[in-house]
């Protein structure tokens, strides 16, 4: 995992104004856990693709407690291919990335129980729960969920298909 900028990411091209709004209408991307890992781990199989996409496409991005905790859990797990020694060692890596001016932190302010956001009848497997939650969070914030997962099911989230962004 990238330590102290072993592979620098593109500089931020936008900043927040005094109200916390972004200075242009470009989309904000909520990164799923795999995108965060790919961006910060230069040994990850998708690192080059993620980095190129980030540099070429992203003006503003977001994370939430779920994606941050998922990153910490996975990259510090001993069976991860390039593990850090502990979650405590992974925290500063992620904190440095999240300190960028193009980052937003979103509180968990959507629920899969909210029928206005989610059609629970379309949640057909446990594998859809986290993806649907992140997609609903992106929709709530008028953003897009950035993922490598081409099979991500969007039908449970109202507006989900338009909010999904698959990194090619």
Q: Each predicted region: which residue ranges?
A:
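Acidic, PIN/NYN-like endoribonuclease modules and their adjacent C-terminal/linker elements
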Residues: 2-27, 110-124, 132-168
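A secondary-structure boundary/capping signal
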Residues: 32-33, 67, 148
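A generic structural signal for short hydrophobic patches within well-formed alpha-helices
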Residues: 36, 68-71, 152-153
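A generic structural signal for well-ordered alpha-helical segments
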Residues: 54, 97-98, 138
């Amino acid at each position: 995992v990238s330590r102290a900028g072993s592979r620098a990411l593109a500089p931020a091209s936008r900043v927040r104004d005094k109200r916390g709004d972004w200075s242009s209408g470009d989309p904000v991307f909520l990164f799923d856990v795999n995108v965060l890992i790919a961006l910060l781990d230069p040994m990850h199989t998708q690192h080059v693709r993620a980095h190129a996409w980030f540099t070429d496409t992203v003006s503003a991005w977001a994370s939430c407690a779920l994606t941050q905790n998922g990153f910490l859990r996975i990259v510090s797990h001993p069976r991860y291919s390039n593990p850090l020694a502990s979650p405590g060692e992974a925290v500063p890596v992620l904190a440095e990335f999240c300190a960028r001016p193009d980052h937003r932190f979103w509180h968990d302010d959507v629920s899969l129980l909210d029928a206005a956001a989610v059609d629970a009848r379309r949640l057909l497997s446990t594998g859809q729960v986290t993806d649907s939650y992140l997609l609903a969070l992106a929709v709530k914030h008028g953003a897009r969920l950035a993922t490598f997962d081409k099979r991500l099911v969007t039908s449970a989230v109202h507006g989900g298909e338009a909010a999904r962004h698959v990194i090619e």
